[in-house]
């Protein structure tokens, strides 16, 4: 347990202590869920330790995915931010990255699914280990992932990019590059935002 806490602390210290990177620095390819040619891009800036993000992920996202992502209407990207406890959120995103593009969202969804129990018990270790294992990151790979400088640098660039876009709260949603809402969205609000994004896209 002590080793695990030390790794999480090192993760947070590493993210906070490196010099800021330029906002235009590359953040790597997007981890897109859905068809790459879907007409509307939905970006959600979220934290794995944000209760509002967890509620959206567990209560609204499944219906959103079925109605918009699985039908080819939307391509979705979750972009990371860190909320307290920031070291746990950072560790979760690092583990999701280590799972690779195909299983990135498997880890993200696994953490959100266990978030309420994690808050209730205070046992972040078990939550992260279980979610990471679902994405194929276990054993020695778990600790190696959390201490990987390249992964920390990549996450830092994503966080810097979010700051550059003025994101201050989670969740925050963009539709085709337009900020729609800071806060949880209902399925009805998503319907309206999707229709507005399509209409704006069709304007000459």
Regions found by a protein language model. Give the residues of each.
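Soluble periplasmic/extracytoplasmic beta-strand elements of cell-envelope proteins
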Residues: 41-44, 75-78, 172-174
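Structural alpha/beta surface segment adjacent to cysteine/selenocysteine redox centers
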Residues: 48, 54-133, 200
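Positively charged n-region of N-terminal signal peptides that target proteins for export
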Residues: 1-3
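Envelope-exposed proteins and targeting segments
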Residues: 38-41, 72, 91, 135, ...
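C-terminal cap of thioredoxin/glutaredoxin-like
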Residues: 5, 47, 130-204
